[in-house]
Amino acid sequence: MLNVVIIGASGYAGAELALLVHKHPELNLKGLYVSAGSQDANKPFSALHPQCLGLVDLPVKPLDEAGMLEAKTGTDLVCLATAHEVSMNLAPQFLDAGIPVFDLSGAFRVQQDGFYDKYYGFTHDQPEWLAKAVYGLAEWNAEQIKKTDLVAVAGCYPTASLLALKPLMEAGLIKADTTPIINAVSGVSGAGRKAAIGTSFCEVSLNPYGVFNHRHQPEISYHLGGKVVFQPHLGNFVRGILATIYVQLADGVTAEQIDAAYQQAYSHSPIVRLSKQWPSIRSVAGTPFCDLHWQMQDGLLIVGSAIDNLLKGASSQALQCINLRFGFAPTTGLM
């Protein structure tokens, strides 16, 4: 079995990943860590996440000097569920020790000059590792994932959006010089576990945010290979993403061509489900699936895409990438 360390285990995505690793027949959850100054350090993991009581009762250790040495010793792979700049600094320390890294943050997703200064507020000082990172969208980058030691797990909104749009782009079905519009809503868990007024029970509603400046818009455009308009919304539910995407089709595109594009992309993918009805968050919450459905009329295509933001949008996608990298069946530990 492979020994796995998770850093950033106190957050929602880290908790989901710990459960997935615990259930995986080929993985052993060796250690859970948080930053040295975290108030969660030295607490039982199940005290932070009661749903894990009796399943994952390991202590959450501080990643101080001794913790880092322990985290590197006898470890086969590391998962980072940490803040973006923290991941940028931590990943090379493990990679230089020969330990593959699966990073759930945005620190290594986009290889574009000035991107991190503009959208993340810091200068990326690991250009060599950034250039080597493989984007962890499992259904589209499987062969590259198998050969890399640094996987930048795709973001939650980008996963829902790209799985819907890439088959159309690859098949040349999107009208030239037009811009797909992505209207997406996410549950409040996407904002993380840290308390904030805007995500408190009494305050949360349904509202747009990040208008024209959300960092996932350029991530989507970069990995799609074309411009998009992306507008996220915060919903008054815990988990899940529902994206409704509007696409102008190239002249003469038929329903048969659209169906063929999606079938070619996903007929052998058990994680992406081509549904006969419009997807809902209820259908995917707590699962690793992405549900897709589409309808066309008068040259306009509308695609619905639903995922669990903490699973397919984060932890279960990371596990898919781990399965690919280490030669396990793609759905091991997921289905």
Swiss-Prot record:
GO cellular component, one term: cytoplasm
UniProt-annotated location(s): Cytoplasm
Active site: C156
EC top class named in words: oxidoreductase
Pfam families: Semialdhyde_dh, Semialdhyde_dhC_1
Catalytic reaction equation(s): N-acetyl-L-glutamate 5-semialdehyde + phosphate + NADP(+) = N-acetyl-L-glutamyl 5-phosphate + NADPH + H(+)
Superkingdom to which the source organism belongs: Bacteria
SMART domains for this protein: Semialdhyde_dh
UniProt entry tagged with the keyword Amino-acid biosynthesis: yes
Entry EC no(s): 1.2.1.38
Keywords tagged on the record: Amino-acid biosynthesis, Arginine biosynthesis, Cytoplasm, NADP, Oxidoreductase
Pathway: Amino-acid biosynthesis; L-arginine biosynthesis; N(2)-acetyl-L-ornithine from L-glutamate: step 3/4
GO MF terms, alphabetically ordered: N-acetyl-gamma-glutamyl-phosphate reductase activity; NAD binding; NADP+ binding
GO BP annotations listed: L-arginine biosynthetic process
Protein role: Catalyzes the NADPH-dependent reduction of N-acetyl-5-glutamyl phosphate to yield N-acetyl-L-glutamate 5-semialdehyde.
Family: Belongs to the NAGSA dehydrogenase family. Type 1 subfamily.
Name by which UniProt lists this protein: N-acetyl-gamma-glutamyl-phosphate reductase
